[in-house]
């Protein structure tokens, strides 16, 4: 959430910044007008409360002197009613202000490419040249099906579209990737966490998913009343429970930075994705991901973003997967992010790079919503800065391995870094069928 004081005192700057993220200037004019009205009502209420105290003293003095205090008592009642009405007005205006603030995205960093969509993203660097073959490479969904290690058809019967079964070496590969990521992240100084996979609405609001993106997630409903949502949602990313672990806490600056990592399932409705990536592992309703989160002080978050991005890059380099890093434009960056680097891995069958990790600096945006603070050496409180990044998306990594390490005979070589996690397996061959 943005700081209303920053918007109030830098209105033109705020309009210019948020215009690059699709926010109309009238929205900020409306917000500032509500804020002005709220502050005026609050000031008047405080003045009346002071007057009430003075009248109360007058009544007490009159009673001590055995004087008539009826006029003062009448005034006291009138002032009390005014205060009650004003406090109700302040509360209503506060809620209107909060409604708008919760739906405004973060201010973009000055270094962000300006543009309305992904076509304005800028390549920052590239690692290794795209994989080339002397045969026509197959897409990962064909490879997985032919090797009998991925099964979308049965998953469609059991669950619906955008679900998959991993089998045999496919399941082993997915588990190997997950464990490899966690081991590498912990070597890089992250503490492993196993978080809850169901979170409440306050947590979803704290990291910025609610109230703007309620259609993108799966919320649990009451068994007795399907139209009544329970206060529980399946996590769209482990970022939600990891960041909210610190919600409402005051940290010691000496503890920072705090680095945590978690492997978890992620559940997404993919609202608005109809017709996109209908085949394969790229866009699923349920997938697994290793997440990295940093809680840092306000002065180091930009350096920490570079470290976070390099942590994610390190994983792709160890796996030998070609990729490039792109800086997202103001119109393509996520709602909570001030700056995002996307890591996009090369997919030979698609002949293009596809996103496999987003590394973002959310500055104090999530911390203000979640009230995550730290106390400096002088005892002063500051809002922390939060960062998050995929380290990495597991299913997309499996897809990239199948496509980049495929052989002409349909088998797939296992990256050297994963062989110890796959009982020494060096080549994935066709699995025998079962249950058919």
Swiss-Prot record:
Residues 43-55 have a biased composition (Basic and acidic residues). It comes from the Bacteria. It catalyses: tRNA(Ser) + L-serine + ATP = L-seryl-tRNA(Ser) + AMP + diphosphate + H(+); tRNA(Sec) + L-serine + ATP = L-seryl-tRNA(Sec) + AMP + diphosphate + H(+). It is found in: Cytoplasm. InterPro entries: aa-tRNA-synt_IIb, aa-tRNA-synth_II, aa-tRNA-synth_II/BPL/LPL, Ser-tRNA-ligase_type_1, Ser-tRNA-synth_1_N, SerRS_1_N_sf, SerRS_core, tRNA-bd_arm. CDD domains: SerRS_core (cd00770). Gene3D superfamilies: Bira Bifunctional Protein, Domain 2 (3.30.930.10), Serine-tRNA synthetase, tRNA binding domain (1.10.287.40). Residues 43-69 are annotated as: Disordered. Its EC number is 6.1.1.11. One of its GO terms (biological process) is seryl-tRNA aminoacylation. Keywords: Aminoacyl-tRNA synthetase, ATP-binding, Cytoplasm, Ligase, Nucleotide-binding, Protein biosynthesis. ATP binds at residues 268-270, 355-358. Pathway: Aminoacyl-tRNA biosynthesis; selenocysteinyl-tRNA(Sec) biosynthesis; L-seryl-tRNA(Sec) from L-serine and tRNA(Sec): step 1/1. L-serine binds at residues 237-239, 291, 390. It is an enzyme of class 6 (ligase). GO terms for cellular component: cytoplasm. PROSITE patterns: AA_TRNA_LIGASE_II (PS50862). Consists of two distinct domains, a catalytic core and a N-terminal extension that is involved in tRNA binding. HAMAP family: Ser_tRNA_synth_type1. NCBIfam families: serS. Belongs to the class-II aminoacyl-tRNA synthetase family. Type-1 seryl-tRNA synthetase subfamily. This is Serine--tRNA ligase. It comes from Lactobacillus gasseri (strain ATCC 33323 / DSM 20243 / BCRC 14619 / CIP 102991 / JCM 1131 / KCTC 3163 / NCIMB 11718 / NCTC 13722 / AM63).
């Amino acid at each position: 959430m943005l700081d209303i004081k920053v918007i109030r005192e830098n209105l033109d700057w705020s309009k210019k910044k948020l215009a690059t993220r699709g926010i109309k200037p009238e929205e900020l004019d409306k917000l500032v007008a509500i804020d002005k009205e709220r502050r005026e009502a609050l000031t008047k209420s405080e003045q009346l409360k002071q007057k009430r105290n003075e009248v109360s003293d007058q009544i007490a003095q009159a009673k001590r002197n055995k004087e008539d205090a009826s006029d003062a008592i009448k005034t006291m009642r009138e002032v009390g009613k005014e205060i009650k009405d004003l406090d109700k007005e302040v509360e209503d205006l506060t809620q209107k202000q909060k409604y708008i603030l919760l739906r405004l995205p973060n201010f973009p960093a000055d270094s962000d490419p300006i543009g309305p969509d992904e076509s304005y993203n800028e390549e920052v660097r590239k690692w290794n040249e795209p994989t080339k073959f002397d045969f026509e490479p197959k897409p990962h969904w064909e490879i997985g099906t032919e090797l009998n290690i991925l099964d979308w058809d049965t998953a469609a019967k059991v669950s619906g579209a955008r679900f998959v079964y991993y089998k045999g070496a496919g399941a082993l590969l997915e588990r190997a990737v997950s464990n490899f990521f966690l081991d590498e992240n912990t070597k890089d100084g992250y503490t492993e966490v196993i978080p809850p996979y169901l979170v409440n609405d306050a947590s979803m609001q704290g990291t910025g998913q609610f109230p703007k993106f309620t259609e993108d997630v799966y919320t649990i409903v009451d068994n007795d009343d399907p139209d009544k949502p329970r206060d529980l949602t399946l996590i769209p990313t482990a970022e939600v429970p990891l960041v909210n672990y610190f919600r409402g806490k005051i940290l010691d600056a000496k503890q920072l930075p705090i680095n945590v990592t978690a492997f978890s399932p992620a559940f997404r409705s993919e609202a608005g994705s109809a017709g996109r990536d209908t085949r394969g592992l790229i866009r699923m309703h349920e997938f697994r991901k290793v997440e990295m989160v940093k809680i840092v002080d306000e002065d180091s978050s930009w350096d920490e973003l570079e470290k976070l991005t390099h942590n994610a890059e390190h994983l792709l380099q160890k796996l030998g997967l070609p990729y490039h890093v792109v800086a997202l434009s103001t119109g393509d960056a996520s709602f909570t992010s001030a700056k995002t680097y996307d890591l996009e891995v090369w997919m030979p069958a698609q002949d293009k790079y596809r996103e496999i990790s987003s590394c973002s600096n959310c500055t104090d945006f999530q911390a203000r919503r979640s009230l995550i603070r730290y106390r400096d050496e002088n005892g002063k409180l500051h809002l922390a800065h939060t960062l998050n990044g995929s380290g990495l998306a597991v299913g997309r990594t499996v897809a990239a391995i199948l496509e980049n390490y495929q052989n002409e005979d349909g088998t797939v070589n296992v990256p050297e870094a994963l062989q110890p996690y796959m009982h020494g397996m060096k080549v994935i061959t066709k699995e025998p069928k079962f249950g058919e």
